[in-house]
Every structure is written in structure tokens, then in C-alpha cells.
Amino acid sequence: YSLTGAQYTHISLAFDEDLSTLYSSTRKNGYTMFPAGPSREYLNRGVFLMRENIPCALYALEVTDEAYTRAKRRTQHMMHHGELYRFNSLGLLLCWMHIRWQRRRHYFCSQFVSEVLQKSGALELPKPSTLMHPSDYAELPELRCLYRGTLAGLPQRQSMELGEVESVMGLYLNVLLGAVKGRVRRLF
């Protein structure tokens, strides 16, 4: 937000109106930039708790049942097989400089959303996914704006029970436990 000057600097997908779970390629622990990759986000936890006065917009896209199913299936696959995917740090920098660069299984947030929407047949984009910025979505005529304001004012967030801001020690402990669980699962 303060670095790029753009009004919106992050984008996520949701498959339900209450926004209980958001999906993106972003920070995995909710606080620090790395580790990053395909992640589930929750409006009542992590960085969303710490930055509640940032600009926020909610858009709806009407899609066919088939496109919805394909988008959800693709997203769930990427979440379930998160170890196969990485955050596209270099691609993010190049996108900011308007340079197209594709890496297999590497995504930044708007590239992730763009790929899911495009490959599911839900939306045709005006430019390649590697050049889509979060703020570009505000300009797409297919999207209907449902809310524009601060994150704290988002109606779906106001109805949620807010979690506590975790300490950094607790955060890294949770990340470490998640990594250990992930390794154990792969052994069986």
C-alpha cells in the first residue's frame, strides 16, 4: 500500500458470501512475508487483525456452475498440494515493472487469482496473469462492487469473532508445527 501507491495491494478468492475462508498465494503464517505460497486466509486472524484500517473492496463475479466447480476444485488442489507450489517473488517484482515472466507453479496473489479464474473459464482477463495487479480487478466490468471502505468496516468481518494477535514466538511455533505435521503426512 505505502510502497506501490496503489489503493489495493492484495487479492484473494472466496467461494462463499460470508468470506469464512479466503484463498491466495501469500504469507503462510499471516505476519511475515516468508514463508509464502498457496494459503488460506481468515479475516479475523493474522495480518488482517493488525491492519484493519487499510482500504478494502469486495467484488462479486457471477459464473456458471461449471466454472464455479472448476475454480473451487483447482483452488482446493493447490491448497492440498501446497508443497508443489511456491510464491513468485521475482514475478511480483517484474509485474510491478510491467515485465511478463512466468514460472511453473510459482504465483503471487493476483497471478494466483487470475490463473484460477481464467483456467476455470470464469473470466477472460485483459492481460496475462503475470501482469495483473490487485487494483486491476477494480476496473473489470464483469465484477460487481459489493463493498468499498476499510477492512474493519467490511460487514462479513464485523460478524466474525476476532482472534487474538499472536506473539511472534507463538507464530513461529505454529509454523514449525505445521512443517513437522506436513513431513509426517508425506511419510505415510
Please tell me what each predicted stretch does.
Residues 1-188:
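Cysteine-nucleophile amide-bond enzymes
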